[in-house]
Regions:
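Short, charged interaction patches at domain edges and termini
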Residues: 1-10, 19-21, 33-43, 83-115
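Small/polar-rich, solvent-exposed N-terminal microdomains that initiate assembly or binding
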Residues: 1-38, 56, 60-63, 67, ...
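Short glycine-rich, basic-tinged beta-strand/loop micro-motifs
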Residues: 40-56
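Residue-level marker of positions within ordered structural domains that often coincide
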Residues: 53, 70, 110
């Protein structure tokens, strides 16, 4: 996951934080977990929360994130077999006034499990 976080940081110039943040700033918060692993192939769900002060900034950064991660056909990116956008949405935090854009990715990798 470290390689993915570094790639997102380089592409967006935003700070990347695990789980969440307690400050009002433009950033990306993430969490990930394994959804399947059969010993040959592992799939992980990467949940990103892009936090911005304006919807215009969210709309500017969102395609950068997607193009950094999503693979087309057999064109590998980073150190995984494939990545697809699996869902998301946008909402406004009424307490802070920030825009939260959710992006859910499924990342397919070679399994690290030795059977």
């Amino acid at each position: 996951m470290t390689e993915i976080i570094k790639a997102l940081e380089a592409a967006t110039s935003l700070s990347i934080k695990p789980f969440g943040t307690d400050t009002i700033e433009d950033c990306i918060c993430y969490s990930s977990y394994v959804i399947s692993d059969n010993g040959a192939v592992k799939q992980e769900k990467l949940e990103l929360r892009l936090i911005t002060k304006t919807i215009a900034e969210a709309e500017r950064i969102k395609p950068i994130i997607i193009s950094t991660l999503v693979t087309v056909g057999d064109n590998k990116k980073l150190n995984y077999l494939g990545c697809e956008l699996n869902g998301g949405g946008t909402l406004k935090d009424a307490a802070t006034g920030t825009i939260h854009t959710l992006l859910f990715f499924v990342i397919t990798k070679k399994s690290e499990v030795k059977l």
